[in-house]
C-alpha cells in the first residue's frame, strides 16, 4: 500500500514539474519575442537617434529654453508650460515653429525610443557648452515634458530626474 501511495505521489509530482516547466518555457517564448531581433532596444534607440539627425529641432528648443533663464525670462517652475514660455529673439513665431519641428521629429520615433532619444539630445545640449547645474536642469526639464506637450500619448512625460543634487562647498 505504501508503494502504491508513493508511486501516485511521484506521478503527481512529475506531472506538476512537467506542467510547470512547459508553462515557464511558454512565458520565456513570449517574453523573448525580440530575441529574434539581433539589435536590442538600446541599440535600436541609438540608431533612431542617429537617423533622426540627433533631434536637431528639439536640441535647438532645449537651448532656447536654457538661455531664457539667463536673460531674466520666465523661469521654469512646477507648472511648466513650454508653449507659453517660448521666447526667441527672432520672434515668438519662430519659437513655435521650432516646437512644431521638434514634435514632428518625436512623432517619427518609436514610442519606446522617445525618452531615450530625448535623454541623448539633452545630454548632447548639456555637453555642448559650459552650463551650470541650473541650465542643465532646465535642459532636462524641457526634455522631460516634450512628449506631453507634443501630445505623444503612448509616452506622456519622460522619467528624467530634474532635481539638482546639493553639493556642499569645500
Curated annotation (Swiss-Prot):
Residues 22-37, 73-88 form a propeptide. Disulfide bonds: none annotated. GO terms for molecular function: nutrient reservoir activity. Residues 1-21 form the signal peptide. SUPFAM superfamilies: Bifunctional inhibitor/lipid-transfer protein/seed storage 2S albumin (SSF47699). It comes from the Eukaryota. The keyword Chaperone does not apply. Belongs to the 2S seed storage albumins family. The mature protein consists of a small and a large chain linked by disulfide bonds. PANTHER family: 2S SEED STORAGE PROTEIN 1-RELATED. This is 2S seed storage protein 2. It comes from Arabidopsis thaliana. The lineage of its organism: Eukaryota, Viridiplantae, Streptophyta, Embryophyta, Tracheophyta.
Amino acid at each position: 500500500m505504501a508503494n502504491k501511495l508513493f508511486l501516485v505521489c511521484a506521478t503527481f509530482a512529475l506531472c506538476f514539474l512537467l506542467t510547470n516547466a512547459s508553462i515557464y518555457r511558454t512565458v520565456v517564448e513570449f517574453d523573448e519575442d525580440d530575441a529574434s531581433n539581433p539589435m536590442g532596444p538600446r541599440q535600436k534607440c541609438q540608431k533612431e537617434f542617429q537617423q533622426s539627425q540627433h533631434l536637431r529641432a528639439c536640441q535647438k528648443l532645449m537651448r532656447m529654453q536654457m538661455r531664457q533663464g539667463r536673460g531674466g525670462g520666465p523661469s521654469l517652475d512646477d507648472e511648466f508650460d513650454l508653449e507659453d514660455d517660448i521666447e526667441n529673439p527672432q520672434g515668438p513665431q519662430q519659437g513655435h515653429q521650432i516646437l512644431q519641428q521638434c514634435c514632428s521629429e518625436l512623432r517619427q520615433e518609436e514610442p519606446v525610443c522617445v525618452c531615450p532619444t530625448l535623454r541623448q539630445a539633452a545630454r548632447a545640449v548639456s555637453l555642448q557648452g559650459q552650463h551650470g547645474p541650473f541650465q542643465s536642469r532646465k535642459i532636462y526639464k524641457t526634455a522631460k515634458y516634450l512628449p506631453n506637450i507634443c501630445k505623444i500619448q503612448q509616452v506622456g512625460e519622460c522619467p528624467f530626474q530634474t532635481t539638482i543634487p546639493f553639493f556642499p562647498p569645500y
